[in-house]
From Swiss-Prot:
Cellular compartments annotated: Plastid, Chloroplast
A GO molecular function held by the record: RNA binding
Signal peptide: none
Record's function text: Usually encoded in the trnK tRNA gene intron. Probably assists in splicing its own and other chloroplast group II introns.
GO terms of biological process kind: mRNA processing; RNA splicing; tRNA processing
Protein name per Swiss-Prot or TrEMBL: Maturase K
Superkingdom of origin organism: Eukaryota
Similarity comment: family membership: Belongs to the intron maturase 2 family. MatK subfamily.
GO cellular component: chloroplast
């Protein structure tokens, strides 16, 4: 890392986060394109054309800045300027390169803060905590002792100007932020860079790295405020939350006789809960507590006001649900989570008398919902919305072994991810859909019926649809009968899963 710092000449800009000169360094764009130091934590291969001229990128930045200061109204292009061509190149392509390079540069101060934070501390070398499954053992251990939770969908999108204003408190470099604001507002197709959807928010394939950085920064800022409220909850009776509106004075407390905020227009309630747990994945988060739903209502009130007063986002009430774990299930990361009361009878013997004691134990229950899986398969054209299998004509040109392997890989990935549920009935139906879809694809290729093709193929088709844990079971119990389903009852969490595989991505 020391060599990397010298290579970027960070010792000249590190003290004041002066990153503006780095934007004009050509090797920054080489790093952003994956041409050097691919093993770094925050550099990834972006897959650009090797024929791209970094010199043109540098000239393009200079031209944009010149245009910005020459035009009275900060017009991006003159009347006779072609927005699609500049210096014989595609402007959109090089604007994309500028965004990617800028994302790399802006990430540097945050990475340096991370290094300074980790100095003198024992770093966890294992990547297991990055796995999606690493969260479920924690939920198993904690959720059975909790009563209520908030099911939160983080609101979006945030206006880009708000993100720039928030970013300036962390990156104290006005020149870089002015250039960033100029790119965002004067980019010819900046509205198409982000694609809002009904229930989610996604980024276009162009400039993903840059806007992922802005979105992650927004979530980080929201969570820092949340953590501040959580840690300072016992002091809210004498502290104004006016500091939430000014990030510069974030950690400075303003003592007031009465707790009345200027922006929130409400009196803060005092609360303190040592059994408060927070979990987030992408835009969905969970706030669970052992206390009553009254505390959850207070937290809901605070979160809504934070989003409206600090980020100027109107949060719809339906985006935050108060859920009682004992009565409802929680949809999280492809599972339905709930806490069920499992009755148990204990016989007690006292001298000559015996009696039964009825007891109820809270048990963390995990179910794989079938509807989202079937919907995902139907979008990928493996079946219809009711689960009736289709053939895949686009795969019919491949070899038989390749077709079987592709179908088998999709099922193994789905079964691998949903191995944490003890109830496998949903996975059995998914296996049925994929096996029949595979058989119909092969029959279509060989211009035969499914029945005759399966008779000729035998059980060879089934072998590709066995997962690793099923193979271990059948090797251990080779003579297991139909009762094997009852014997094979165990919950497995894999620590090598970093994303949810969508069947549509296997197209």
């Amino acid at each position: 890392m020391e060599e990397f710092k010298r290579y970027l000449e960070l010792h000249r800009f590190q003290q004041h986060d002066f990153i503006y000169p780095l934007i004009f360094q050509e090797y920054i764009y080489a790093l952003a394109h994956g041409r050097g130091l691919n093993g770094s934590i925050f550099f990834e291969n972006a897959g650009y054309d090797n024929k791209s001229s970094l010199l043109i990128v540098k000239r393009l930045i200079t031209h944009l800045i010149t245009q910005m200061y020459q035009q009275n109204h900060f017009l991006f292009y003159t009347n006779d300027f072609n927005p699609n061509k500049f210096l014989g190149c595609n402007t959109n392509l090089y604007s994309q390169m500028i965004f990617e390079g800028f994302a790399v540069v802006v990430e540097i101060p945050f990475y340096l803060r991370l290094l300074s934070f980790l100095e003198g501390k024992e770093r966890v070398k294992s990547h297991n905590l990055r796995s999606l499954h690493s969260i479920f053992p924690f939920l198993e251990d904690k959720f059975s002792h909790l009563n209520s939770l908030l099911d939160i969908l983080i609101p979006h999108p945030v206006h880009l100007e708000i993100l720039v204003q928030t970013l300036r408190y962390w990156v104290k470099d006005p020149s870089s932020l002015h250039l960033l604001r100029f790119f965002l507002h004067e980019y010819p197709n900046w509205n198409s860079l982000m694609t809002p959807k009904k229930s989610s928010f996604s980024f276009s394939k162009r400039n993903q790295r840059f806007f992922f950085f802005l979105y992650n920064f927004y979530v980080c800022e929201y969570e820092s405020i949340f953590v501040f409220l959580r840690n300072q909850s016992s002091h809210l009776c004498s502290t104004s939350s006016e500091t939430l509106s000014e990030r510069i004075c974030f950690y400075k407390k303003i003592e007031l006789e009465e707790v009345f905020t200027k922006d929130f227009k409400a009196i803060l309630w005092v609360f303190k809960d040592p059994f408060l747990h927070y979990v987030r994945y992408r835009g969905k988060s969970i706030l669970a507590s052992k206390d009553s739903s009254l505390l959850m209502n207070k937290w809901k009130y605070y979160l809504v006001n934070i989003w409206e007063c600090y980020f100027y986002i109107w949060s719809q009430p339906r985006r935050i649900h108060i859920n009682q774990l004992s009565n409802n299930s929680l949809d999280f990361l492809g599972y339905l989570l709930s806490v069920r009361l499992k009755p148990s009878m204990v016989r007690s013997q006292m001298i000559e008398n015996s009696f039964l004691i009825e007891n109820a134990i809270k048990q963390f229950d995990i179910i794989v919902p079938i509807t989202p899986l079937v919907t995902s398969l139907s979008k990928a054209k493996f079946c219809n919305v009711l689960g009736h299998p289709y053939s895949k004509p686009s795969w019919a040109e491949s070899s038989d072994s390749d077709i079987i392997e592709r179908f088998g890989r999709i099922y193994r990935n789905l079964s691998h991810y949903h191995s944490g549920s003890l109830k496998k009935i949903s996975l059995y139906r998914i296996k049925y859909i994929l096996r029949l879809s595979c058989a119909r694809t092969l029959a279509r290729k060989h211009k035969s019926t499914v029945r005759s093709f399966l008779k000729r193929l035998g059980v060879g088709l089934l072998e590709e649809f066995f997962t690793e844990e099923e193979q271990v079971f059948y090797l251990t119990f080779p003579r297991a009968s139909s009762t094997s389903g009852k014997l094979y009852q165990r919950r497995i969490w894999y620590l090598d899963i970093f994303c949810i595989n969508d069947p549509a991505n296997h197209e």
